[in-house]
Amino acid sequence: MGTGKKEKQRRIREGTTKDGNIRVKGENFYRDSKRVQFLNMYKSGKAIKNKHGDVIRAADYQDTTIPDARVQPDRRWFGNTRVISQDALQHFRDALGETQKDTYQVLLRRNKLPMSLLDEKDSTESPRARILETESFDQTFGPKAQRKKPRVAASSLEELVQATEEENKTYEEKEELKATLGLMGKQEDEENGWTQVTKEAIFSKGQSKRIWNELYKVIDSSDVVIHVLDARDPLGTRCKSVEEYMKKETPHKHLIYVLNKCDLVPTWVAAAWVKHLSKDRPTLAFHASITNSFGKGSLIQLLRQFSQLHTDRKQISVGFIGYPNTGKSSIINTLRKKKVCQVAPIPGETKVWQYITLMKRIFLIDCPGIVPPSTKDSEEDILFRGVVRVEHVSHPEQYIPGVLKRCQTKHLERTYEISGWKDATDFIEMLARKQGRLLKGGEPDESGVSKQILNDFNRGKIPWFVIPPEKEEDKKRKLDEEEVKSAKMQKVKD
């Protein structure tokens, strides 16, 4: 006898002729139980009332009857909890504060610590307005009050409207001036003490919203951020505003310096800058070249150390940020030992960020060059840092005196094989006549020769560098000692 017949007889004996499956009301050939429950969800949520308006069945979460609640009996209620005394917390906070300032130490497993308790907040400055210090309650309210009405500069409503319109007009003019980068001419405000000088639009390169969005994407996606600096002027190509942003918003990300273009400066200059910058962050000297590089092994070893610190992750991402034309893409090509990023000796070659695989656990991210806006930087400083393409600059001959200040005379004589110039104009004219770059009437092509000099200056054909602070102090100290010695010798002769 089959199993199905036995089961049928058992149901008849027990009086249950159903097949055992629980069916939902409304289920049929067209709607299955899941669809019916989904449709009933729309109908639910309302209370059911009788004809008198009394609630027969309350809606969900509407019932006023409170069920009996009991605390779950558990042995853990009577065991030790994770507590810490204030002395131990303060001791740990002091130790953590000392190590957080040291950029050569890494905090592992940050999520295991109560960072909200450990981070000390500056309680000296209160965010509230200090109104009571300037004007007390007694001077405003009570029998000794000196104020009878609010302090408004206007005596009537018409004057208030007029003053508001004037302030709004002044604000709109100021914002329009900012948007055009001062192209409307020199503007001065003696009361506020600001002066807006005419500035070429080309000198705003690297400050657009699109490029800053690319930078933020690179910072958010990176575990390690490499700040690429130009070895000739590391402090000039250093983005301090980005460092402050990372220190405040992303303190868990690692930031290191890479001093690129070390082949353009003497060895003692590169060593002095590495020593100076190592006080703030880990610093490496680097020369980007696919065939003959320097510092490649040290950088790869450092990245491997960072990957070993984050063993809980499958891979880490390394982002490259910095000024335009500092060699970010060239460093990536050097690490990969082949051309994976487009490079050029002109700024602005990298337009968007891109991912490159270095090895199984390390990825590299290339970023467009950024220029933090600064009121201290002049057009000459921006041009000499390689931010702007020289062919787009108008009147390039006005920047040649700055080149003569930064470069030694012997280097210029050796590069261009000329000597005996008196000023920048004389230097341009001598070089133009030597190269045969003359216009109609035998006049020198000052604009073309000036662009050539600026390109040679930015691309490393003319040797120049900024002296490190320690070496500059030593130089001043030696000069002072020599002056003291010469003064003593004069006294002895007298």
Swiss-Prot record:
GO terms for biological process: regulation of ribosomal subunit export from nucleus; ribosomal large subunit export from nucleus. It comes from the Eukaryota. Pfam families: MMR_HSR1, NGP1NT. CDD domains: NGP_1. Residues 212-373 form the CP-type G domain. The keyword Nucleus applies. One of its GO terms (molecular function) is GTP binding. PROSITE patterns: G_CP. It is found in: Nucleus, Nucleolus. Residues 1-20, 473-494 are annotated as: Disordered. Keywords: GTP-binding, Nucleotide-binding, Nucleus, Ribosome biogenesis. GTP binds at G322, Y323, P324, N325, T326, G327, K328, S329, D366, C367, P368, G369, I370. The keyword Nucleotide-binding applies. InterPro entries: G_CP_dom, GNL2_CP_dom, GTP-bd, GTP-bd_ortho_bundle_sf, NOG2_N_dom, P-loop_NTPase, TRAFAC_YlqF/YawG_RiboMat. GO terms for cellular component: nucleolus; nucleoplasm; preribosome, large subunit precursor. Transmembrane segments: none annotated. GTPase that associates with pre-60S ribosomal subunits in the nucleolus and is required for their nuclear export and maturation. Belongs to the TRAFAC class YlqF/YawG GTPase family. NOG2 subfamily. This is Nucleolar GTP-binding protein 2.
